[in-house]
Amino acid sequence: MANQEKYAQQMQDAGVCDARGAALCATVKELPDGSFGMVLLGVKGNDLLIYDANMKSEPLKLMRTIPLKGVTDFSTTSLMGEILKGYTFRFTSDGFTYSFKNCRRQAFLDVLQQEINK
């Protein structure tokens, strides 16, 4: 099993994402509650789940669930940006603009885009 497949399976087993394996670590500029930093993102059904990535092997703490059905203004950086430093993507939900950077899994962004477009 390849590393990405193992990672996807671990994330599914932990409940972070569904069978599509759309999960990754990223840096968030700011969440509505003022928190920021490293987070673990997962797409489960039509929701984006945001977990605290505390890096201390503690149980995952769900920080926020964002229904992707109401997301607007989704955008991502170009392929060249991804090659150099990882994707940045942003969107607006309930009047707040979320911005994530250092994302290195195109498959995650593909699933996210599919759910937003439903």
Language model feature labels by segment:
Residues 116-117:
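IQ-motif-like calmodulin-binding regions
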Residues 92-111:
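Canonical phosphoinositide-binding patch of PH/PH-like domains
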Residues 31-40, 44-86:
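Phosphoinositide-binding peripheral membrane targeting modules
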